[in-house]
Amino acid sequence: MLQANSSNHEITVYDTTELYGEKGKFRVMEFSNKAIQGALDLNHPKRILFEYPRAIIHLMEINEPYFEDVFVIGHGIGTLAGYFAEKRFKIAELDAEVVELSRTYFGYNQDNVVIGDGRYILESEQPNAYDFIILDAFTAAGTPRHLTTSEFFSATHSKLNSRGSIIMNLMGKVEHDPLVNAIHTTLSEQYPYLKSFALPAEGAADIQNILIIGRKRPIQFQARQMAGFTEINLGQGHMIWD
C-alpha cells in the first residue's frame, strides 16, 4: 500500500482481493474521503471495472462513431484514454501526483496529460476543436463549482464541433437534488439536447453516479449497452453563474 499527499488530496493506492463484492486481484486509487478514483483488474488489465466509464464509452461510440478528438477534465487512472489509445485525447488534471501514480501503478503510458485547472486549459483551446468534452473531476466537496456554471458550459459549447457532445459524471441523488438539478438546468441553456442516466439504486436518497450528456444534435443510446444505467428525468433547478 502507498499513501501520498498532494496539495489537493491525500491519495492511497492499495491492492485488494475483493472489490464491491467481486473476488479477484485489484489495484485501487482512492482519495482521503474514501472516493475511489480508479481501479485495475490485475488479472485482466484491459477490463473496465466500473459501469460509468462503460456507459460513457457507449455514448461516445454511438453518437459519433468516427470521433478523433477528446478533451477530458479529471484523469484518475486514465481509463478512457487508455481504452481509446488510438484517438487524440488531451487530459487536464489538477494534481501532478495523480498522474504520476497512474503511470507507476496503473500502467498509464501516454503523454497527453496537462497539469492545471481544466477550465482554464480548455478556454485556451481552439474553437470547434473537439468531438467530446468529458467532465470527471471531483474534490471532497463534489464537482468543482467553476465547472458547473453557465459561463463554463458556454466555453465547452464553443470548443466542440457541430456534432460534439459534453458528457458529465456527477455524484448525487436522482430525485430532489438541488445541485444536480441546477447543473442540468444550467447545461440546458447551452445545449438543445440533453439526456440523463443513473444506475438503479436502493432509494431515491442514495448518492450515486449520474451521467448527463449535452449535444448540439439529437442523442442516441441503446439501453442494453448502457452498463446498467437507465434514463432518468431530472427536475428543474436554478441557474449557476460564475
What are the residue ranges of the model-derived segments?
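Short, well-ordered turn and helix-capping elements at secondary-structure junctions
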Residues: 17, 117, 198-200
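SAM/dcSAM-binding transferase cores
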Residues: 1-28, 36-46, 50-54, 58-65, ...
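General small-molecule cofactor/ligand-binding pocket signal
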Residues: 14, 112-114, 195-197
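Conserved S-adenosyl-L-methionine
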Residues: 191-202
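Short strand-turn motif at the edge of the Rossmann-like AdoMet-binding core
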Residues: 138, 169-173, 199
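The AdoMet/dcAdoMet-binding core of the Class I SAM-like
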Residues: 3-8, 44-165, 175-184, 205-207
